[in-house]
Amino acid sequence: MPLTVRLVSWNVHKCTGGLDRRYDPMRTVDVLTAANPDVVLLQEVAQNGRWYRHDRQVDLIGDALSMPHRSYFVNVRFGPRRGEYGNAILSRVPITSSSNIDLTLANRKARSVLHAELRLPTARGGTRTLHLFNLHLGLGEAERREQLRRLLTSPALQAIQLRTPTVVAGDFNDVWGTLGKRILVPAGFVGPARPLRTFPAWAPVRALDSLYSRGDVEVLELVRPRSRSARTASDHLPLIADLRLLSPHA
């Protein structure tokens, strides 16, 4: 029986609406609950700020989704009022290891990729490995290119065999929709057949967010929800991907 996984990638904008600027983590939870994911890759997840009621959003969202396995790394620190934020991976299945890959360039905002290794139970009582890389790239075009090159040459990615199921997803800030094709595809990754516009959420014109896969995994479907809650909960729309892990002997 094929092993399938539903994954959501989303820049949640610190659970703050892109239009109304209202902090409402339950809107974020509602959108994610409707997607019914097995694993979630989130960017701009905040904590420790008065503006966010001192919520630790990774735990607030994880508890609401009944996802006990979590990895979180702070990228940007502001102070007592605005707190800090970073990338998070939440999962229904165990995260066996995780690490953060620093992609920050000189004189630029801190950026990174959160890497997690998951073990997915199979019908026959075994497990399959799935590697996830949750990224949030910079605003400059040259900056983004260099950050992706650093990811490709990082020890974490270099150690993964080409056939091992691997997904790179997140907020690429890819204004022109060419970044992954130019850098990830030549490295063996497969991207979406067509870019899905995700920004701004209420009237999307840019495909800033994306998902690429490599190895014994295929993307069965990649969609962006357009519900009212999805268009108001953040300034980005989420991406929902249905993945199927292929037989390692295929």
Language model segments and positions:
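Membrane-embedded segments
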Residues: 48-58
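A short beta-strand-loop structural module common to alpha/beta enzyme folds
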Residues: 41-46
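Active-site regions of metal-assisted phosphoester/phosphodiester hydrolases
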Residues: 1-39, 53, 63-64, 69-250
